[in-house]
Amino acid sequence: MEHSAWHELIKAQLPEHYFGKINQFLDHVYAGGTIYPPREKVFAAIQTTDLEEVKVVILGQDPYHGPGQAQGLSFSVPNSVPAPPSLQNILKELTDDIGVKQDHDLTAWAEQGVLLLNACLTVPAGQANGHAGQIWEPFTDAVIKVVNSLDQPVVYILWGAYARKKKALITNPKHLVIESAHPSPLSAYRGFFGSKPFSQANAYLTSQGRTGIDWLR
């Protein structure tokens, strides 16, 4: 990340030496137990999607906490792993909205400019939200603010109450915010299914002169 366009802009949004605190936190937690995703994938979202290429932001809460699932991109798992329930529902809504995507791995979205960002970038094995409130929120809020400052139009897809709180950080009138219930089985039938976020995002991007996302890749 140090050599990317992200680095200095994120750094400018944070207290002095915050990157050092993050590295100390990572050294500590990875030395003390099983943490997901693998350490080399903690920053995968901003390593895979260049700042200049961001077209869509899909905000998650924290990584999957089961073995082999988390890969540093919100909602994504390797194709070798069964899709968790929220991802199953995302793919079901995608099928109803645009068409069938076979992959559970969403890397192809990230490579097209979909920033798949979790608010917390690490999680202890088996402990959902186990690192919430410890180190990550100022960092990921800074990422959202950096994207908010871009001149080109971006679509933010905010699923569920936690993600929707971040709407306060999105102040640039060039951007579009799409909100709905979370794709979790607990809430998917309360406004997620039928929300058509993927076609909505592409319609806005193309209306603003940007190429849409091939969501079926």
From Swiss-Prot:
Its EC number is 3.2.2.27. Signal peptide: none annotated. HAMAP family: UDG. This is Uracil-DNA glycosylase. GO terms for biological process: base-excision repair, AP site formation via deaminated base removal. It comes from the Bacteria. It comes from Streptococcus suis (strain 05ZYH33). Excises uracil residues from the DNA which can arise as a result of misincorporation of dUMP residues by DNA polymerase or due to deamination of cytosine.
